[in-house]
């Protein structure tokens, strides 16, 4: 009787754990921007960027990675941000060819 009760408890625990894992959406972003930098960053300092467009985040953003390995959130609507992304895209295309 005790063995079957222990087995039942283990089975229920395993079921609850698997339900929690399945309930987690796979597309939860690992990073969101809550504050945007207002300061223009020199293109020479930038290494790469990442667009944050998930509806799970409070706002759309671009995260620039600098050569000093800093991450800076900026507004993707800013003209200088769009120019910097274009520059980095062209730079990465030249490196690939």
From Swiss-Prot:
Keyword Acyltransferase: no
Protein name: Eotaxin
UniProt xrefs under PANTHER family: C-C MOTIF CHEMOKINE 13, SMALL INDUCIBLE CYTOKINE A
Localization per record: Secreted
Annotated GO CC locations: extracellular space
Signal peptide interval: 1-23
Record-level GO BP terms: antimicrobial humoral immune response mediated by antimicrobial peptide; branching involved in mammary gland duct morphogenesis; chemokine-mediated signaling pathway; cytoskeleton organization; eosinophil chemotaxis; inflammatory response; learning or memory; mammary duct terminal end bud growth
PROSITE patterns named in the record: SMALL_CYTOKINES_CC
SS bond list: 32-57, 33-73
Family matches, as CDD domains: Chemokine_CC
Keyword Secreted: yes
Positions bearing carbohydrate: 94
Function recorded in the entry: In response to the presence of allergens, this protein directly promotes the accumulation of eosinophils (a prominent feature of allergic inflammatory reactions), but not lymphocytes, macrophages or neutrophils. Attracts eosinophils in vitro but is not responsible for eosinophilia in the ovary. Binds to CCR3.
Gene Ontology terms, MF aspect: CCR chemokine receptor binding; CCR3 chemokine receptor binding; chemokine activity; protein dimerization activity
Sorted UniProt keywords: Chemotaxis, Cytokine, Disulfide bond, Glycoprotein, Inflammatory response, Secreted, Signal
InterPro entries: Chemokine_b/g/d, Chemokine_CC_CS, Chemokine_IL8-like_dom, Interleukin_8-like_sf
Entry's family note: Belongs to the intercrine beta (chemokine CC) family.
Principal cellular location given in the protein's record: secreted
Superkingdom per UniProt: Eukaryota
Underlying gene: CCL11
